[in-house]
Amino acid sequence: MSDKLIIFDTTLRDGEQSPGASMTREEKIRIAKQLERLKVDVIEAGFAASSNGDYEAIRSIAQVVKDSTICSLARANDKDIARAAEALKPANSFRIHTFIATSALHMEKKLRMTPDQVYEQARLAVRFARQFTDDIEFSPEDGSRSDMDFLCRVLEGVIAEGATTINLPDTVGYAVPEGYADLIRSVRERIPNSDKAVWSVHCHNDLGMAVANSLAAVKLGGARQIECTINGLGERAGNTSLEEVVMAVKTRRDYFNLDVGVDTSQIVPASKLVSQITGFVVQPNKAVVGANAFAHASGIHQDGVLKARDTYEIMRAEDVGWTANKIVLGKLSGRNAFKQRLQELGVELESEAEVNAAFGRFKELADQKAEIFDEDIMAIVSNEAQHDANEHYRFISLSQRSETGERPHARVVFNMDGQEHSGEGEGNGPVDATLHAIESQVNSGAEMVLYSVNAITGGTEAQGEVTVRLSKAGRIVNGVGTDPDIVAASAKAYLAALNKLHDKAVQKINPQI
């Protein structure tokens, strides 16, 4: 059995299914490039047949990412598989991941197919996919609740047809570590051709055991691929956290005896990027990437760490990408210094025009606050990345008036399809007034389901990062805006969310694996 653990990242596919986490093509490309710097083995870039937007995003990622295998999900039918293969064609290395449900409940209620029909369709799907690539992954949806005899029959059949990775998902997060490991081991032992495939796990965190289940399946069940997401992003309670399984295997190599190719110094930058793009703030006590992950409040612990770090730290903060929150630039810093710092932070901008736009925003910010931190620079880049030629709404300016005892009044100027619009509104507070001002011109009909504010750095000069979540006609999107002025950040976030609602290239089919 191999001593290499394959890391399969599905942030861009399964992670995006978290309500409000939908991303634009440009945002997906930025995350894919960071995943490449992280050196994940496989990037599941999306589900090509779900929408034109997902197809184009996968194709764009396949064109720019060269060092990771690019994967697309596909249902077990020729149309989906051909669509996936077409999207993946530009990739240096690609995988088709096809699936069909195998539990009695899913076959009867959802697919309305007999077991024999499912068996045949699974085999034919893998056979068809082999026309395009030798790298085929098969998942029996709801596999952990499937009849063991039937599950083994299906998996033996798809391996015979050429499936090279078999992924056994815990679709509803019901499994427990020992039982899940037993399932993987039992299936492998019962299938005569099991040695011809890599065995993979895909766990959901509904009972808080996704990481534990994945690691148990690796150590006790013989799995050699873990499907995971940055920050554990995903629908319901999320997926297996990439950062946690990677650091568990790295830190406890004495126990797992496995090698992982991930560049762990890129973990925190990846976490911050996904958080900034999706608007999903990482909880402070989150393992590895939380703000308090390496903080010690106890006097005894602090004393121990000062004397010898390994008294209370089992891994080093710098090994996962945490750096000191130092001042890097100021208002007198030039364009070359700014560009150099972007490179040090692992930020790649596509053109000099993008560098110039980001530098212009940096100079504006430097006039407002004396100390510019790395987090400020990352926020600037994220803000600028939201702007593209197809942008429907774009913030220009804001003025507001608020006196004690009077309802606040706001005036917002913004572009809508290239035309400048000015809206005015009143509300219970300055933010409420600002959003009413925007709606006076937009009339979106959207419902706000979340509004949150986060300080990017410490101090009263810190930029505010606002996340707005809107819902309309069954679609839920997030918008993120940053500015030293919280009200302006709110306007930017609201317009960013409206842009995503306006974008028709949104995933329509969201399968659970």
Swiss-Prot record:
Alphabetized UniProt keyword annotations: Amino-acid biosynthesis, Branched-chain amino acid biosynthesis, Cytoplasm, Leucine biosynthesis, Manganese, Metal-binding, Transferase
Domain of life from the UniProt record: Bacteria
Essential cofactor(s): Mn(2+)
Subcellular location: Cytoplasm
SUPFAM superfamilies to which the protein is assigned, alphabetical: 2-isopropylmalate synthase LeuA, allosteric (dimerisation) domain, Aldolase
Reaction(s) catalysed by this chain's protein: 3-methyl-2-oxobutanoate + acetyl-CoA + H2O = (2S)-2-isopropylmalate + CoA + H(+)
Pathway noted in the entry: Amino-acid biosynthesis; L-leucine biosynthesis; L-leucine from 3-methyl-2-oxobutanoate: step 1/4
Gene3D superfamilies documented for this protein: 1.10.238.260, 3.30.160.270, Aldolase class I
BP-aspect Gene Ontology terms: L-leucine biosynthetic process
PROSITE patterns for the chain: AIPM_HOMOCIT_SYNTH_1, AIPM_HOMOCIT_SYNTH_2, PYR_CT
Domain spans labelled Pyruvate carboxyltransferase: 5-268
Enzyme nomenclature, EC number: 2.3.3.13
GO molecular function: 2-isopropylmalate synthase activity; acetyl-CoA C-acetyltransferase activity; manganese ion binding
GO cellular component, one term: cytosol
Binding site for Mn(2+): D14, H202, H204, N239
PANTHER family per UniProt: 2-ISOPROPYLMALATE SYNTHASE 1, CHLOROPLASTIC-RELATED (PTHR10277:SF9), HOMOCITRATE SYNTHASE-RELATED (PTHR10277)
Family: Belongs to the alpha-IPM synthase/homocitrate synthase family. LeuA type 1 subfamily.
Purpose: Catalyzes the condensation of the acetyl group of acetyl-CoA with 3-methyl-2-oxobutanoate (2-ketoisovalerate) to form 3-carboxy-3-hydroxy-4-methylpentanoate (2-isopropylmalate).
Assembly and oligomerization: Homodimer.
Name of protein: 2-isopropylmalate synthase
Organism: Cupriavidus pinatubonensis (strain JMP 134 / LMG 1197)
